[in-house]
């Protein structure tokens, strides 16, 4: 799948070094809820799962052909049972923050979710201090549902709340 500046595609083994580059950035992993990778072998193990998955796509910058992040629609049956729903997740190399890349990728993935997959609702969340993620979510038409208190425990031991959002197919179509 292509956008103006990006190619959203399956992960491949050639992505290992670019993946490790952003997975090892301390300000990237913490915002996604995982410990930054210290060894490339950690990234290799995760990359094998990404390659096998149909839920996650690599984000490649067209101009440089560099893998700069990932985006995906993940199964999430914790909150909505019997509803065609997915949870949006994404991560971006911090060198590419602030240029609209993630909003561009999310917009393309929402189209796939609602038009191709016929989803009824897509959810997304961010930790309260992650203002950049909030902006991506709101720019793409998600509505704030509320705060999920004590949502998860980080690798540091810190207990995190989660700001929860969603967008329905109807809202998506009206926005377009």
Question: Which residues does each predicted region cover?
Answer:
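A short helix-loop-beta-strand connector motif used in the catalytic cores of GNAT acetyltransferases and
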Residues: 47-58
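Acyl-donor (CoA/ACP) binding surface of acyl/acetyltransferases
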Residues: 1-27, 56, 60-176
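Conserved GNAT-fold acetyl-CoA-binding loop/helix
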Residues: 27-48
């Amino acid at each position: 799948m292509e956008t103006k500046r990006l190619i959203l595609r399956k992960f491949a083994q050639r992505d290992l070094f670019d993946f490790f580059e952003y997975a090892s950035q301390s300000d990237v992993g913490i915002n996604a809820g995982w410990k930054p990778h210290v060894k490339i072998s950690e990234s290799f193990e995760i990359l094998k799962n990404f390659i096998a998955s149909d839920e996650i796509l690599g984000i490649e910058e067209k101009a440089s052909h560099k893998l700069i992040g990932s985006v995906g629609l993940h199964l999430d049956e914790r909150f909505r049972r019997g509803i065609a729903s997915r949870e949006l997740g994404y991560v971006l190399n911090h060198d590419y923050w602030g240029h609209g890349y993630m909003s561009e990728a999310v917009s393309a993935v929402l189209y796939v979710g609602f038009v191709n997959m016929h989803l009824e609702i897509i959810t997304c969340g961010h930790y309260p201090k992650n203002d950049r993620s909030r902006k991506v979510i709101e720019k793409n038409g998600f509505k704030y549902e509320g705060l999920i208190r004590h949502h998860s425990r980080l690798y540091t031991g810190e207990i995190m709340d989660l700001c929860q959002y969603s967008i329905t197919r109807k809202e998506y179509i009206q926005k377009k």
